[in-house]
Structures are given as structure tokens and as C-alpha cells.
Amino acid sequence: MIQRMSKLFVRTLREDPADAEVPSHRLLVRAGYIRRVAPGIYSWLPLGYAVLRKIEEIVRQEMLHIGGQEVHFPALIPREIYEASGRWNEYGDTLFRLKDRKGADYLLGPTHEELFTLLVKGEYSSYKDYPVILFQIQTKYRDEARPRAGILRGREFVMKDSYSFDLDDAGLAASYTAHREAYRRIFDRLGLRYRIVSAVSGAMGGSASEEFLAVTEVGEDAFVYCRNCDYAANTEAVEIGVPDRLDPTGQPPPQVLDTPDTPTIDALVDRLNSLDLGRRFTAADTLKNVVLKTKAPGADDWELLVVGVPGDRDVDLKRLAGQLDPIQVEPATAEDLARRPELVRGYIGPQILRRIGVRYLVDPLVVPGSAWVTGANEPDKHMANVVRGRDFEPDGEIGAATIRDGDPCGRCGGRLALAQGIEIGHIFQLGRKYTDAFELDALGPDGRPIRITMGSYGIGVSRAVAAIAEQCHDDAGLIWPRSVSPADVHVVIAGKGEQEKLAEEFAAALDTAGLDVLLDDRVDASAGVKFADAELIGIPSIAVVGRGAARGVVEVRDRGSGERRELALTDAVAELRTLAAGA
């Protein structure tokens, strides 16, 4: 197929959009792939839609390869279905909710576990019907509080979601493995550099969970990997090595210290080292107690939660939220603290929390038997030698402290490294959360009901477009992998007359060879503008018909490496066909 730039619905831009935060957003807009409609909502133009469709087709092929069957569900879902699973409340403000003219409540689907489960329940009843894998590729909706980075975090996006239904946990494990391998093939074909990391399930429910993260500095998902073993996890699920528990026997008793004007850790450490306490102190010797508030799904009121971490670290709110999900968590406000005068900002200690009915959790780094300097629960006072297990006991542990490069691996003791990525896929062993909610059973060979177990597997199809753009670009523009490029060859006519004639012959020969061609036949654009647009648009092979036209020669450029070669027309067709076949 030949697409002509003179007819193509595209306008490239020389200036970056004002709201562009990351390269993919900037380049996809400038190259005419997408256009903004509203925050987090974008239209797909012909070039962008071509890339999106190619990614969809790769995903579809690999899903069919593992026995998946494609379906398509409505985006509009009645409230009752989400209430049955508990997610009407669990999703909170993330759901787009609406009413019809009769006042009935609906939502725009963020995922479709409930509908898949109900469909299978309505159609299948025997153990002989299982296992089954169903999938769809569909637009999803989430009311993101802060949509950003173009199509990386939008309020409307294209997603592949698939679901496996098995008779037992062994079957679920097999379906999970099949999806995991299919995802590896998909992302390999897309040309993405990615990591598979352990994750938490959150509001999705279930047990085992892994994310596929495209590695890029602009990714908003932090993850860690071990330099010594193959362990990798996002920061919500990371397991770091912690010190051994200590014996509190023989520890000195708590000591109240005068610490005026020390509401921060730095000020406290300076004050401690100005006192004659017989040792030097660092922030790691202090216990930082951070006041937060939580709200359970369906609850009307917020409850205070205090989280303790070593003073040389902060509370990682995203890590904490991932483990508390679906419970919402936010920093407590000054108004929240004003309602609890026992909590003295900057001087909060764990000793009174249980007595006043405030839940207290500590990071595992606050090991039993360890001694700390912490607040004395009155202004300008701290306490030294406060020992966990002797002077206070938390209500539980939760991984909440920020992770640092070089922290010990919880698996092998090696050193962890920090990196950033974009979540492009997520796989879950859901278990029976939804089949319990909707009582999805199959009659076994003995006539007894078997509760079906599920897996859930998502790929961000539209997000993958942005992830590829993040990894595959340079200062001049995009550089698409051949597997997803909107065309195989971008033919640039650098002049007029015989150059135009040869370019038409060349494009026709490429079309006959089965290649998709973008022919820049614009007569009102200079050669310089055409070259700049070719680099911006990013088709991997650029063929320039210029001065060599008189000799029947075209210049073939590799958009990625910059390599240029002059080839006779027939040789150029053969070369480009070979390159396209390797996509």
C-alpha cells in the first residue's frame, strides 16, 4: 500500500506542545500521531492508529497462540455487578460513575473481571468445559486524579485483558505460565526492553502477581533488581534484607531528653550530638513516626494510622498504598492532628499510641529488640533507649520505608539496584475472589460442584505505544521498531522531474513487493522539511530519491543507525523487502 503525504491526514509541528512532560508525549504530538482533546484524553490520527493496530495484532496473535478466544464486552456496566464483587467501593474515585435517564447507576469499565465471570457462569456448567481462556482488546476508563505524560497515564486507554478459568490451582498455574511466556513473546516482538518484577495485587485481589515494566528513566514505577541474583520487584512488593532481631536484655532504660526546637530529624540529630550522651548519633538512630489517615472501602470516616520508619528514611507512600490497597491512605492534615492533641507534631513517640487507640505499624527495619531515639509525646522532648518489645509493641509490620540503592536483597543478601519503568503488562493469579462473589461452579465427574479458579492478565496496548516511543527515539524524532512502524519505507522525493518519476516507479515496485510505503510527494515542501519530517515520523527505513535518479540509484538510510547506502532501484527493493521480512 502507498500512502501519500500530500493526501495523508497529518500535520507535523516544529515546536513542542506546552504540556509535554516526557519525550514520548512531545514526539507523538509533534509527529502527528495523537492530538489532545482534554487532560488524559487523546485522539489517534492515521499514523498513530496504524501503530496501535499493529500492536493490537501482535497481542491478538500471541493470545490466540495459547488458546485464547476473543470476545468484546460493553464499556457500560451496571452498578449491581460491581457491588457484588465489592469493587464499586474498592475503586473509590477512580471509577467513572453515571446515571441513566431513569436514575440507574452505571460505570465505565476499568477492567472486566465481573463480566467475564458472569459470562462463563451463564454458558458453562460442566468440568468438561474447562479450562478456558477469553480475552478482549477494548477501551478502558479510569478517572485519574492527575493524568500526565500524554498517553502514558490517561483517563481513556486501550487495554488487552484476558482471563483464565480452571478447575484447580494446578490448572491456574499452567494458565499463568502460558500467559507469562506469551507476554515475553509479545514484548520481544514489540522491541521493548523490559523487566518482569514481583508485584502486589491490590484491588484486583488474588495472590501471585507480576508486572512487566518497560525500562526507562521517565517511568513512574520504581523497581529494584538484585545485582547478584535474578530477583526483581516493584517497590510496593520488594523484600529487602533486615537485621536480625536483638535481645533487649541489658539495654539501658528509656531516658527523657530536652530537645527544644527539634521538630525535624536533622535538627534532632544536631541536638543529640550537642549533649553529653557518650556517643555520636545519626538519623539512622532515630525512629520517625509519620501520621497518616486511612479509609476502608465503603467507610464514611477516615482513621488515623501512624507508621514508624528509621529516621534516615522516609515513608514511601506509594509503597505503603500498594500494600494497603483497597484501603485508601493519605497524609494526615493539620486539622486531623488538631483533633488529637495527644499527637504532638514533631515529637510523636510510639509509647502512647495503643493507649489512645491509634493504630501503629512499623517497617521491618525496626526490628524487635532495637533501641531508638523517638518522640516523648510532649513539646521539646524526646526519649532515648526506647526499645521495641520492651517499651512499645506495634500493631504489626508493613514495608513502608523508602528503598535505597545498595539495600540488601531479601533473597540472597546481594545488593539491590533502583531503576524506573513503565508498567506495560500485569498478570495475576486471582484465585477465587470473583468466582466466590458470583458462585461460579462446575459440576465435577462425581456430580459435586467445583469452585472455578481464575487468572487475570492485562496489557496496556495504547501505553505500549508511548513506552516504545520512550525507548526508541533520538533528538530528531521517533525510531519505530519494524514490527510496529506505520509503514515499512518512507520514500522522500528530494527534487522534481526525473526524481519524481523514479520515486513513483520505486514506490510502485515496493508496493508490488508487499511493502507499505509512505511517499512524501508534497510539492510545496522543501527537501529539508521532508528530511526533517522523515526523521520526526520515525519509519525505520528512509529511501531518498535525489541526485542519483539520473543513474537509477536511490539512497537507503537506516533511521536508527544513520547508515546510508546508494543502491540501484531493484537492489533497493530487495534490500528493503529483506529488512521488512525480519520485523
Swiss-Prot record:
Keywords for the protein's UniProt record, in alphabetical order: Aminoacyl-tRNA synthetase, ATP-binding, Cytoplasm, Ligase, Nucleotide-binding, Protein biosynthesis
Gene Ontology biological-process annotations: prolyl-tRNA aminoacylation
GO molecular function: aminoacyl-tRNA deacylase activity; ATP binding; proline-tRNA ligase activity
Catalytic class of the enzyme: ligase
Main localization, broad class: cytoplasm
Catalytic activity annotation: tRNA(Pro) + L-proline + ATP = L-prolyl-tRNA(Pro) + AMP + diphosphate
EC number: 6.1.1.15
Annotated localization: Cytoplasm
InterPro entries for the chain: aa-tRNA-synt_IIb, aa-tRNA-synth_II, aa-tRNA-synth_II/BPL/LPL, Anticodon-bd, Anticodon-bd_dom_sf, Pro-tRNA-ligase_IIa, Pro-tRNA-synth_IIa_bac-type, Pro-tRNA-Synthase_IIa_type1
A GO CC term attached to the entry: cytosol
Family to which the UniProt record says this protein belongs: Belongs to the class-II aminoacyl-tRNA synthetase family. ProS type 1 subfamily.
Summary of the function given for this chain in its UniProt record: Catalyzes the attachment of proline to tRNA(Pro) in a two-step reaction: proline is first activated by ATP to form Pro-AMP and then transferred to the acceptor end of tRNA(Pro). As ProRS can inadvertently accommodate and process non-cognate amino acids such as alanine and cysteine, to avoid such errors it has two additional distinct editing activities against alanine. One activity is designated as 'pretransfer' editing and involves the tRNA(Pro)-independent hydrolysis of activated Ala-AMP.
PANTHER family, sorted: MITOCHONDRIAL RIBOSOME PROTEIN L39/PROLYL-TRNA LIGASE FAMILY MEMBER, PROLINE--TRNA LIGASE
UniProt remark on domains: Consists of three domains: the N-terminal catalytic domain, the editing domain and the C-terminal anticodon-binding domain.
Assembly behavior: Homodimer.
HAMAP family with a match to the protein in the record: Pro_tRNA_synth_type1
Name under which the protein is recorded: Proline--tRNA ligase
Source organism of this protein record: Acidothermus cellulolyticus (strain ATCC 43068 / DSM 8971 / 11B)
Gene: proS
